[in-house]
Amino acid sequence: MVAGAYVPTSGQILLDGKDVTGLPSHELFRRGLLRTFQIAHEFSHMTVTENLMMVPDRQSGENLSSAWFQPARVAREETAVRRKAEEVLDFLKITHVKNELAGNLSGGQKKLLELGRTMMVDAKVVLLDEIAAGVNRTLLNDLVFNIERLNSELGYTFFVIEHDMDMIARLCDPVIVMAAGSVMTQGHIEDIQKNEAVIEAYFGGSPTGNATSPAAEQPASEAQP
């Protein structure tokens, strides 16, 4: 619903205090709300740089009339977009793959590319769907590091759906636990891991006293760093 795929039957979705409930995904995109996917969707036969340059909306070069009658304007815009892409590549420290076909990237590199796409339009809120899935530990650390930087240095807000509790513990406060489509509880990760209602809902048991109980390993966790 937050991403615009479904229209809620009640309640509101607010972005910067403005009601965006029911807006389609492309309108949310223009307002700065973007998402990544558990399975990356790259343009596999385009380079990493070209994938980034595809992101900004309403580029003059997309219009046949502008491309034909305003070539100088199109060239200026393309230069600016390419410069922005280079800045993103440098920020994420993946300039070494800028000319690589995106389809040749590893799973973790594709997730970095998806994160880079959100930077091409200076997103306000980014929805991260299972960003740790299929990513080796080294690249996952890179992902988490860059998410932290985007939050602390550029003011991005992240809404995370994730089952990797180490990642959630590092990134997210608060953590929201949902069951059967409703919010069960929210709070700091350490409190969530000891919450009897969470343990009962997901394991049908009670806490054993272990502060790192696996009880919170299954809930979908949504959070803002």
Say what each PLM segment does:
Residues 3:
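Helix-to-loop junction immediately C-terminal to a conserved catalytic motif
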Residues 12-31, 69-75:
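ABC ATPase NBD Q-loop/coupling interface
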Residues 62-97, 124, 145-148:
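Conserved ABC ATPase "signature" region
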Residues 126-129:
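Catalytic Walker B motif of ABC-type/P-loop ATPase nucleotide-binding domains
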Residues 141-154:
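Helical segment within the ABC ATPase nucleotide-binding domain
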Residues 168-170:
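A short, surface-exposed alpha-helical micro-motif characterized by mixed small hydrophobic
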